[in-house]
């Protein structure tokens, strides 16, 4: 069976989802279930995982026994903040080491700061973390992050929360062709066709949050995204027909057609 393998663990779903921007935890759980996702990313700086005992905890609706939680460093702009946040996550989740690193460079665009990301990744990997890393669609940056030991490369399709879809498929294709670890599109997906295109390009998975949470019907969109990722993956494995401006061979046979029969 075709599985997504990250850091030695196999997953049936290639759709990863976030937990922010929903109306409440109940809607979060319902949408996650509809998506079929097994890996759920959580913003440690914005989500209660037990650090505030007086408030409801996300772990009550998305327990680690049912999902692989992926703590992330959303909102971090420095190496120090990112590393501190993931150390806290490891404490809150009883030694959990699979994490998503993002070090942002600009509060308006939320574009990644690659220099700081490389520094933070190196520190975290030395401390035993398995780092899935948010990055730009720069193939050189992606290669450098893989070389220092990141277990998955997560290039943006377009800016976080923009819903603009895949703006540079050529760079993504270069990253995919060169990578020896999973490549998961992270950020910019707006609708199901974007997810399908990412998978058709050969991405190993797609991570999204706003595309589902900001939809008019988040649960229905989660279901659509599940199907899109599955369809895109199957299309990639099947191998599409080559593109041609003109086709000299019709899809239906002409032999035996009235008017083409010999002797008539």
From Swiss-Prot:
InterPro entries named in the record: Aldolase_TIM (IPR013785), Thiazole_synthase_ThiG (IPR033983), ThiG (IPR008867)
Reaction(s) catalysed by this chain's protein: [ThiS sulfur-carrier protein]-C-terminal-Gly-aminoethanethioate + 2-iminoacetate + 1-deoxy-D-xylulose 5-phosphate = [ThiS sulfur-carrier protein]-C-terminal Gly-Gly + 2-[(2R,5Z)-2-carboxy-4-methylthiazol-5(2H)-ylidene]ethyl phosphate + 2 H2O + H(+)
Domain of life: Bacteria
This protein's UniProt keywords: Cytoplasm, Schiff base, Thiamine biosynthesis, Transferase
Location in or out of the cell: Cytoplasm
Record GO terms (molecular function): thiazole synthase activity
Family annotation (SUPFAM superfamilies): ThiG-like
Pathway: Cofactor biosynthesis; thiamine diphosphate biosynthesis
EC number per UniProt: 2.8.1.10
Biological processes per GO annotation: thiamine diphosphate biosynthetic process
Active-site residues (renumbered): 100 (schiff-base intermediate with dxp)
Residues given in the record as 1-deoxy-D-xylulose 5-phosphate binding sites: 161, 187-188, 209-210
SUBUNIT field: Homotetramer. Forms heterodimers with either ThiH or ThiS.
Family designation: Belongs to the ThiG family.
Function: Catalyzes the rearrangement of 1-deoxy-D-xylulose 5-phosphate (DXP) to produce the thiazole phosphate moiety of thiamine. Sulfur is provided by the thiocarboxylate moiety of the carrier protein ThiS. In vitro, sulfur can be provided by H(2)S.
Designated name of the protein: Thiazole synthase
Protein's organism: Nitrosospira multiformis (strain ATCC 25196 / NCIMB 11849 / C 71)
